[in-house]
């Protein structure tokens, strides 16, 4: 109906467009009207022109509407005829259904004509005087057919029995497979839950352990750094001492060289002394001789005692000098020996310092390597987290697919038989529970994932903090090196002062004693440093052992994580396969039920159905074998989980052993290990409790499955009863077959066919009656709509007539106004020519004018009210009736003087 109205609207718009060209050319009557309207304002003239156009188009619209109404009535009559005589409910369906309906009628007519021809031929071929031989032949043929039918019936009975047995086996297998699959699904869900919980616990434990290990490593790093700083300070002090000693050694070497020179000079002098003494003796002798000779000459009285006294004086002087020289030599030799001892001590201290520097450098390199390993471990953990996130997304996708498959399974279960509705409801509830559990598990896993991410961020922040500490400590090292440089400068100044002091021999002795004391002090410090170095080496060895243990534990955890991921992937794949198999089995069940129902009607093609059922049974047997294999694989997986639990207990035992071995260490480490042991024992207890819960759940599930098995047995019993009913129907069919054999006349077959045709015709008639009833209801609705539209159209006509009457009244008033003006101009001329008689006429004219004005004002008010009412009705109709908005839009735009933009805005606001 709405399509017809839209077509009517299109036709009207086309006719209006055609009529516009005719309307554009003004007629002489319009010209006269325009001349008449010249006295009115421009707005009213424009509106009147529009109304005149609508006046000319109105009869066209009426005629078009009447034609379309006649067409719609004819179409309704055609629809009624088609609905009464054909299965067509709507004209829209006529294109598809009418040709098929006529083809079916033609086929039926052809079949009836063929049967009539066959019957007429049979009647013509059979002569009235049929011979006895032909009758005997027919009887023999009939008996043979009877025997063949009996044999076929026996074969069918045997096949039916075999089919019943096969159906029982198939149903049992199906029940077993369904129960096994449900058990597997529940077991897999429990395993997945346990694995997720175990993973979460393991991850939490590993994170806590990593935090503890990081804290321990941080403490160890800080201790090692403190030790390194102390060693560096000691090295700097030792280096200062070494420099002092080297400067002292240099000074001593200089003094030694000077003393050696002095010694060489003294040796030369010692060598030259005997020669000088001999020369002196010779000179003295010569002098003595000369003196003697002089004395003999001068005095002649000098004694021999004087000569001897002079000789003794000279010898005593030489011996004293020689003794002094010997003492100096001995002192120099002793000092030289002390310098050699100093050299040896200096070389020993240098070697020790070099060894200490090498050890400290190696320790620093090791600590740097440990930091690098920690950074790599952090990067690996981040990568593993990313992999876990990707695996999470994959698991979500898998769960979505599983949900979609479950929805498909729901739809298939809805289409199944009414007897399985209770089971379907239980399965739906289980599926909803599974979905809810999956959603909760995903949410929990996401929350844990966020917690792990936050923990990793905290760890990364801690690592950055450690790096900052390293940089700060490096800065402290640079400051300490600067301090060392300053100390070196001070030491150089001190050495310069010492060089000034060492020029004097007296100060050397005191400095020597002080140096001996400092050497003893340095030796004690070296011993202390060596002890500290041993302690630091032991601590580093312990740290290495702890790091090795932690790395081994991390490797084990990673391997366990990988194995668990692989198990999850396998379980998810097996879960999907089980769902697919479940869907396939449900489809097969539906197919078997449909085929079982079709067995009642199918008689001739029973062998083909038996073959197909056998194939399906074979396929089901194969699937049963596969399901048993999967059950075995799941049992193996359970054994593997038990082995994992045993491995964890072994790890706990090993940790206990480690705790017993490490009892000799500090009390803090012992407490930490005891806490770890307690945590692991709690984990073990939790795992044992979870295993007990799983066993209890499995026991309850077994009881539930037993209950379902009993229900399925009851269903099997019902199916057996149905089979017995079918057997009874088969017996009835046998009786019918015997009756048919007794009936030899062909007319009986024809009558049965005719009865079937009549039953089919009755069914078609009942369907046609139903369709006719539906069509009548639809027609009534359409009639109501049509009446409403007619009423609306009548209202529009009334409004249009009132407008046209108002226009005519306006035109008449305009004519009367013009005639009044002409008469007024004539009366004014007569008044100008007249003298006294015009005074009463002048007095009467204003009263008439006032009456005319009052009447015109009343008429204008009434016209305004009518226009307002008309506009109101049009607006209300436009807002109430969506169907007529396209038709009323130009009227509203004309009344309200709307532009194209205003029209668009109005339409958009209404939409």
UniProtKB/Swiss-Prot annotation:
GO biological process: Golgi to plasma membrane protein transport; response to endoplasmic reticulum stress; vesicle-mediated transport
Annotated region (Disordered), positions in chain: 16-41, 271-314, 814-850
Residue numbers carrying Phosphoserine: 308, 660, 827
A cellular-component GO term for this protein: cytosol
Composition-biased stretches (Basic residues): 286-299
Phosphothreonine PTM sites in chain numbering: 830
Keyword Coiled coil carried by entry: yes
Compositional bias (Polar residues): 822-847
Coiled coil: 101-280, 312-735, 766-814
Stored Pfam families: GRIP
Predominant location category: cytoplasm
Every GRIP domain range: 861-909
Subcellular location: Cytoplasm; Golgi apparatus membrane
Free-text note regarding domains: The GRIP domain may serve as a Golgi targeting domain through its interaction with the ARL1 Golgi protein.
Subunit structure: Forms oligomers and is present in high-molecular-mass complexes. Interacts with ARL1.
Role this protein plays: Involved in vesicular transport between an endosomal compartment and the Golgi apparatus.
Further details from the record: Present with 2350 molecules/cell in log phase SD medium.
Name of the featured protein: Golgin IMH1
Organism: Saccharomyces cerevisiae (strain ATCC 204508 / S288c)
